[in-house]
Amino acid sequence: MNIILMGPPGAGKGTQAELLKARFPIPHISTGDIFRDAVNQGSELGQEAQKYMSSGQLVPDEITTAIVKERITQADCDSGFLLDGFPRTTDQAQALDQSLAELGKKVDLAINIDVPTQLLIERLSGRISCRECKRVYNLNFNPPREQGKCDSCGGELVQRNDDRGETVVKRLEVYNQQTRPLLQYYEAQGVLFNIEGSRGSGQVFADIQEKLESL
């Protein structure tokens, strides 16, 4: 099964991706991870992407799509994949569909985790993570046992620059402008599954699991 995981920043995509990966035998493909892998491996596509990334520019769609396509052709994706962080625009979605069609595949389900804007702001502005092991906490909903210290490894807890104040609001605005149209795109294909993400992660996952097992 080929799954797209969608939702605004702070919706809990990372948590659901980990739960899905543990339950279903398909790889979790994060575009951030495969960009880093391509760059570290020194592949031709990775070198092209690095030129843009190092100068602070967005990587063009054709390079991003090619890197994603290269990843989903690997053997561990034969039974499906969970794609997180791509596509972000309808142009990217169309390019992905074309790449999948060339491989005799298609998107089976696009999961959209929907969360009210005010709750997203609270989640993001309270989000901190461990500098060492990258475990994520939330000062409002899931604080560490000891202030400033990771429960898992004792590392220092820090807040990302893009999880602060006005930056959070801007990130959500960009998401709404660029990514919201994707919902209409996948709805037209009959593969969109909207889920209320303001509940606990266990409840959200239970609904996603029920949907996947019904397909």
Swiss-Prot record:
CDD domains hit by this protein: ADK (cd01428)
Chief location: cytoplasm
Residues annotated as region NMP? 30-59
Report the GO terms under cellular component. Answer: cytoplasm
Q: Where does Zn(2+) bind?
A: 130, 133, 150, 153
> What UniProt keywords apply to this chain's record, in alphabetical order?
ATP-binding, Cytoplasm, Kinase, Metal-binding, Nucleotide biosynthesis, Nucleotide-binding, Transferase, Zinc
Note down the stretches annotated as region LID: 126-163
Q: Which reaction does it catalyse?
A: AMP + ATP = 2 ADP
Name the residues that bind ATP. 10-15, 127, 136-137, 199
Annotated EC: 2.7.4.3
Positions of AMP binding: 31, 36, 57-59, 85-88, 92, 160, 171
Q: What pathway annotation does it carry?
A: Purine metabolism; AMP biosynthesis via salvage pathway; AMP from ADP: step 1/1
A Pfam family annotated for this chain is: ADK
For molecular function, the Gene Ontology terms on record are:
adenylate kinase activity; ATP binding; zinc ion binding
Q: Please state where this protein is localized.
A: Cytoplasm
Q: Which GO terms describe its biological process?
A: AMP salvage
Q: What NCBIfam families does the entry give?
A: adk, PRK00279.1-2, PRK00279.1-3, PRK14527.1
Q: What's this protein's function?
A: Catalyzes the reversible transfer of the terminal phosphate group between ATP and AMP. Plays an important role in cellular energy homeostasis and in adenine nucleotide metabolism.
Q: Which family does it belong to?
A: Belongs to the adenylate kinase family.
Quaternary structure and partners: Monomer.
* Protein name according to UniProt: Adenylate kinase
What gene is this protein translated from?
A: adk
